[in-house]
Amino acid sequence: MKWKTSRRSFVQSAAASVVPAVLMQMRPGVAKALGSLGADTPEAAGDAAWKNAGVVDTARSPFAKLRPVPVRAVEIQEGFWSKRRTTNVDSSIPSMHDELIDHGRMDNFLRLEGKSTQPQKGPVFSDSDIYKWMEAVGFVLQSGDRPSLRATTESMIRDVVAIQEPSGYLNTYYQDDRKALRMQYDVQTTGHELYCLGHMLQGAIAIYRANGDRTLLDAGIRFVDGYLLPNFGPRANQKGIVSGHPEIEMALMELYRTTGERKYVDLAGYILHGDSRIPLRQQQVVYMYCGIPFPQRTRLEGHAVRAMYACCGATDYYLETGDPAYWKTLNTLWEDLNQHQLYVTGGVGARETGEAFGDAYELPNARAYGESCAAIGMMMWNWRMLAASGEARFTDVIERALYNGINSGMSLDGRTYCYRNPLAFDPKGDSSDRHAPEGKIRNPWYDTTCCPPNLERTFASLPGYFYSTSDDGVYVHLYDNSAMSWRLKDGSAVRIQQTTKYPWEGTVKITVSPAEAREFVLHVRIPGWSAKNTVKVNGAVVSDVRAGAYLPIKRRWTAGDTVELSFDMTTRLLKANPAVNEDRGRVAFQRGPVVFCMEGLDQANKAGNLVGYTAKLDGESSVRYEADLLGGVVVLEHPGAVAQSAADTGLYYSANASEKVTENAATLRLIPYYAWSNRAPSTMQVWVPYRYS
């Protein structure tokens, strides 16, 4: 039976509750999967089950090939990511707390509690800033207790739940004369009520999984059970739901995984399917990326963050139901992402107007939007696709975004942030750029401050992305000095230790130490960017190593067995598809997973701009690690030239008038893209014009 149900017939066929309304529309296999949900719930696994949950807890998801390893089971040791994570905990999260307080985000709650006389401040989604910050703290606490941070968060949670209404409703914006607007159809499209609830649930779950504290979680459940489920859904006596800004879908799915309550899967499925009773214009359906059955989507369009979050929720739904229509659509959208919409830095979203995806191959550089939240959403989506498939193509995309378009979003000192992440920039350029006031692309605060706490929760949760387990063994996804202490499917303990200088060097030593000798498969990822690879097990070379895939190493492992990986760290000069107009005649530099860029202040002429520089396409880059530069980075130097025009050169001149322009040899100096704009203001570009010798 093919999925051809319209939104109207879906709603008309709704029965006495959300559950049968959804089940009636599904293939027998999907309905059976839904009917069995909750049979092996977290509650049934013991009182301490919250300790064992991953970032996305697919441990019991019937259509997941991989199971997560909890944040607490992985230690990121001294190396590349440890510096970022230390800065995140010691600088970013505390300073963002102060920004949230200074800009009235907590006063919005305190006002309703009678503890503040300040008026409501901030946009409609202000509550979500608090919840994302709390989620970041939850992941920090999963790596180890921080008493002061925990106490601060517990105090904030008490103030949040104190204003919850008897119905379960909890939102600081729709109060006083705005109460009548709650969940009205025209408000649902842009009002962010369910978006805020989604972040409340995600923050609550992260905190619950850190220390078992259910205070915020129970408040979130009361909101869903007491306010949403009785009043909103497909029944004739209920109002319809459109999420407006997808987020609630994946939050409900994670709430199911936390509680075992099937009704949350069904509610998420109803929202993903859309409700024809809500009148939507086509432009709204495109921009919001919701409101019609998700399987009807054929391309990525509209608001980039909304689209990525919708894909996260849809993948979560597939992981629990196995609906093939969802999986087919998700793969179609993923191909669109990788063939037409993905920046070389892992950023997504080309247009400032609507913070949106553009047309196929529309990937401008200076005008690139590349919102930090969109890159994070894209990583979150690919993590779920990886869980469903076990395929390295998704991990390659995660790595590209993580090292480049996400890592660029936070300054090296952790106190300023990029809302957008362009691939070319001039601080003296467009004065109308609202995200770069006075030419500053990094700022400590934005009134739409979704990106800073989103970056903070991502870096706090990073240990949970390094490893997974499967029916046959362990998967190693990301590389850095780290140690996983967890267990195989049969419950036996195993420790995986990585020793490496990745991403600056391409060698990784993995030491495998099961508590007792065990036969299982160690799946190690061979990055798609690495052309030549060597793998050794206890010194013996392994054959059939393929780039862009997981290498399965099956053996009886004993404590101290080693796997040595050697990746190709040759600097690669990348060309874009000719259909990408702005990149035609240009190259981008990538070494390992790291994309590089030029900053004007690094070039020999110190001119402050990058006009006229070209790279020799057949030149060879030299590589040098500079420990005292930008926290310690690899620097590339590449032969090229810089052109200078004669004083009388007009706007246009004859192609034969060679005397108008002179070229002098120059050495181009490039730094990692993630580290740009951490010194004095400077021009920057990723895509460099090239020439042949």
Language model region names:
Residues 1-5, 32:
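Secretory targeting signals
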Residues 9-33:
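N-terminal export signals
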Residues 37, 41-53, 268, 330, ...:
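C-terminal beta-rich recognition modules with glycine/proline-rich loops and embedded aromatic residues
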Residues 42-147, 151, 181-210, 246-263, ...:
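Aromatic (Trp/Tyr) and acidic
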Residues 176, 180, 184, 188-191, ...:
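Asp-box/WD-like beta-propeller blade repeats and closely related beta-sheet repeat scaffolds
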Residues 221-293, 299-307:
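Hydrophobic, small-residue-rich alpha-helical packing segments that form membrane-like cores
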Residues 519-537:
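Beta-strand-rich binding/interaction modules
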Residues 536-540, 592:
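Short strand-turn-strand beta-turns centered on an Asx-Gly dipeptide
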